[in-house]
Structures are given as structure tokens and as C-alpha cells.
Amino acid sequence: MSTRRHFLHTALGFAALPHLARAAVPGGVSLGFSLYGMKTLSLSDALKTCAEIGYANVEFALNAGYPTEPKVFTAEARKEAAQQLSTLKLDLPCLMVNISLTADDKAHAQALKTIRDAAQMALDLSAAKPAILETVCGGKPATWEQQKAGMVERLQSWAETAEKAKTTITIKAHVGSAVNSPERLLWLLEQVKSPAIQAAYDYSHFELQGIDMEESMKLLLPRTKFIHVKDSVGEPGKFQFLLPGEGRTDYVKYFTALKQHGYHGPVVVEVSGQIFNKPGYEPVAAAQKSYAALASALAKVG
């Protein structure tokens, strides 16, 4: 488990990283880190870590057990976090909510409350530029045909709630969920047709299925408002997520394609629970290693 002593020790090594100036990122892409992968650090230390490494933005995780879970993230704590984000010049583009389109009625009602709570948190943290929301969709690939009509109904309810709360929800395809492909994700978006529902892009889930990077970007980037990035190895049914740079993804090609498709916005490292739940996981080292791999590739993209 990471400790404050480890945080202070590893902070001394930040200067050795290939630092990429935040103000001079090619193509309007900025690198970020999801605090989903820093559960064992205090929020203050997590933000300091990300800023010192060179990240331009962070994602807060609203999951149970995190310091930013809505029911424990007090008004005073939100005020302090907003001030620290400003001081460190870190943007907060997104809040991870992890709700499901295949939930039962009770869980669906809770999901709607989560949307409202997250929208309020976004305003509390930055009324001028509130963060949007991000989630996967739930279900299993094999149940898509049976569940898709119900998922549309749930998504319509999400959209209505998001519109009233003046927020945007980005939904993400996942290799293990009912929505596992660009086509299925786009189909859902087309059924609901709400500006409050957009796409989140994460190529690692498509790579595992042999889906071409360029094709997935061509389909999804016109509707994409947020990007997660990580590596992966294996195939559907038996896979392992990895840190960026540990897998097969060519990140020079990746960032070049993002630029060619006109994407402007955050590319945020998501450390999978497959990684951070392993004994000996160190969030600071993971953030450093991920930044080094991505910043090096991004610097090569003119």
C-alpha cells in the first residue's frame, strides 16, 4: 500500500521524467490521469502527484470508498479541492460515475440520483467550466439483443436527468459489456439523440477484439467528448489491462490519428482494477510510467 512517505520519496524523481509543456501540446490534446487509480492516496497528495509529473488534467472517481464519493465529499472539501486544482493549474474535465443501463429499477433510481449528485459536484468544483460525466454501460456482450431495447429506455431516462441537471454523460464501450463495439455504442446514441449523451473512447477495449484503431476513431470521434487510455493483452474472455506503453499500442500512430480526426481534449490514463488491486501496486510509479510513455509519443507528433 502506498504511504505518504512513499509519495514524498518518489516525488524526488519527477524531474527525471520527459516533461511535456502543458501549453505546447500538439493538436490540442492534453494528458491526464484518472484518480480511479490513486485510491490509496489522499486527494491532496494525488493532485500534487499529477501536477508534479506534468499531467494537465485529472478525473475524479465518484465510486464508493474514494474521497470524492459524493456522500463523503463535503462542501468544505470540495472548496479546498477546487482551490488546489486552480493553484496547481490542473483541469477537471470529467467525473467517473460507473452506473449501468442494465440495472434493476432500484439501482436505476440510484443511478439517476448519482447523475444529479455528480452534476452538482461538477458545479461546486467549477461553476465556470463544470466537468462532464463518464461511465460504462453494463450487461454482457452475449445479452445485447435481449437487453438493447431496455438499455435505450434507461439511457433516455439518463438523458432527461442530465438535461435537467445541465450536464453531459459520456458512455464507453467495454470489451466485457453489452456495448462492446463502436457500432453498438453509436446505435444507442442514435436511438436517444440527446446532446446530453455523448461517447467516451477507449481503444484498449477494441484492440482486444481486433478492431482497427483508425476505423474505431473514424466511427466514434465525431461523438467523443472524453478519452481514456491504457494498454491491453489477450482476447475477449481472457485479457489483462496494462499501463500505457506496456502493450502493443503504437502511441505515435495513436496521437497522429487523433490529430488527423480533429480531436481536441483530454486523453486520460485509466489504471484498471486488474492492476491496482494487485499486491504491491504503487499509484505514483504507475502515473510516472504512464506519463513517460505517452508524453514521449505525443512530443513526436508535429
Regions found by a protein language model. Give the residues of each.
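Conserved long hydrophobic alpha-helices within structured protein cores
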Residues: 50-61, 115-124
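A short acidic, helix-capping loop that chelates divalent metal ions and anchors anionic groups
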Residues: 65-69, 101-105, 141-144, 208-209, ...
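Glycine-rich, proline-tolerant flexible connector loops at the mouths of alpha/beta enzymes
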Residues: 61-82
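Active-site acidic/histidine proton-transfer and metal-coordination neighborhood
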Residues: 11, 17-20, 45, 84-91, ...
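Hydrophobic faces of well-ordered beta-strands that scaffold small-molecule active sites
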Residues: 29-33, 58-60, 92-97, 131-135, ...
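Residue-level preference for long, well-ordered alpha-helices that form the structural scaffold
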Residues: 70, 74-77, 107, 111, ...
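Histidine-acidic metal/acid-base catalytic patches
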Residues: 2-30, 39-56, 182-201, 205-302
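Active-site beta-loop-alpha junctions enriched in small/polar residues
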Residues: 34-38, 61-65, 97-100, 138-140, ...
